[in-house]
Amino acid sequence: MLLQKALVLVGSLVYDNNILSAGTEVDSMKSCGLQKLAMVDYPGKLAATVFTGGCNLRCPFCHNALLVTRLNETPELPEAEVLAFLERRRGLLDGVVLSGGEPLLQPDAADFLRKVRDMGFAVKLDTNGCFPDRLAAILEAGLADYVAIDIKNSREKYPQTVGIPGFDTAPVEESVRLLANSGVDHEFRTTFVRELHTAADVEAMGQWLQGAPRYFLQNFADSGNLIQEGWHGFTALELQGFADIVRPFFSQVELRGIG
């Protein structure tokens, strides 16, 4: 079913290459990118993914450096134009993913999600978990159907993994607790980097996050657009070993990005 809908969408996207219109008033959330058709970003749904710019973290292996440290090189896409595109995709797309960067840096993120929900789309939010108050407001308002938190590493190794000495994990821990008690479908996921992650870290993350419905292990891949060069991923066999370590802690454990 997803493949059939995707084929229909691919045929229609040629008419949407120029979604910017002159004279549009910009007074709300701006994105820095729009993936018009995403088949894997939202589990089980065909979606469009909206990328916001800016992030409070500086993970050295981040594959989206343009959205984090070089925003002046990234053109902004006004919210009105994103919504206009989504209006044309009603009945074809199932959902919308708000990703980044870090979406909850955007003061109007909740308002944008409300508009998307009002259009009839399911909503997935990707976040690093650093803004529990904003996450709580979104959850309480029923503005997200699915939330993914990027767990960077064991709590002890967060500072070096996010590139911020002395980083306090308390906000991330609060976001984890919020999701666990929210009743909202969610996942935790970690991008594994050979120079930063060990089997002991995997065990520690499993114990910290245990009881969550699903945990995904993602392999680092060099996008050519990193904040810092010199990082490497693991072999598929090594990642499978990590998955076996955390399997007792979660209902579902899967690998992503393993070709």
Question: Residue ranges of each PLM-predicted region?
Answer:
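Short, positively charged and aromatic/hydrophobic N-terminal segments
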Residues: Y15-S21, E25
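Short, charged low-complexity linear segments at domain edges
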Residues: D27-L46
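Conserved alpha-helical substructure of the radical SAM core
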Residues: A65-V96
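Conserved AdoMet/S-adenosylmethionine-binding subsite of the radical SAM
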Residues: L83-G95, L104-L239
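Positively charged N-terminal leader segments that act as targeting/secretion signals
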Residues: A6-L7
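Canonical Radical SAM [4Fe-4S] cluster-binding loop centered on the CxxxCxxC motif
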Residues: T24, Y42-L77
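A C-terminal junction/extension of Radical SAM enzymes
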Residues: Q240-G259
